[in-house]
Amino acid sequence: TPFGEHLVCQVGLIVENIERTAQKYCDIFGVEMPPIQVTPTYDVTQTTYRGEPCDATARLAFFDFGQVQIELIEPDMQPSVWRDYLNEHGESVHHIAFIVKDTGAAVAYLAGHGIDVLQQGLYGDRSGMYTYLDSAPALGVMLELLENFPQPR
């Protein structure tokens, strides 16, 4: 399969208030507050949602716990995989993520299992791309694919 070593690298959580939730993680786990980042808009990320250009943004915070990263996501009000999920499910686990070397191959493989792309875009620094897939009906959770592009040396 295109999933390499099958290592889950990230668990994403949708939240209403990123500062409040991040502070709870800091208090409970005794870790430092990470910087809160805002995803860039379409002109940078080329994000599509359900196949259409998408201007939605989100505020993100990342906690590294060993080999697994916890991502907190506070969406803006624009339609997106993040906003729709928060509206439908409230604050909860949003996705599990895998690092892949070839997003196209992974997407084609999953399409063969009836799992289609929901949202896709470039990282804010354009060093890679993310892809959310409509896997919850089959797997009970949304999948995210993360591809880091080779960097010039």
Enumerate the predicted regions with their spans.
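Vicinal oxygen chelate
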Residues: 1-2, 8-16, 60-68, 85-102, 104-153
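Catalytic phosphate/metal-binding cores of nucleic-acid and nucleotide-processing enzymes, i.e., regions
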Residues: 5
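Extended intrinsically disordered, low-complexity coil regions enriched in Ser, Thr, Gly, Ala
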Residues: 17-40, 83-91, 100-125
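Conserved short beta-strand elements that form part of the metal-binding/catalytic scaffold
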Residues: 32-84, 127-150
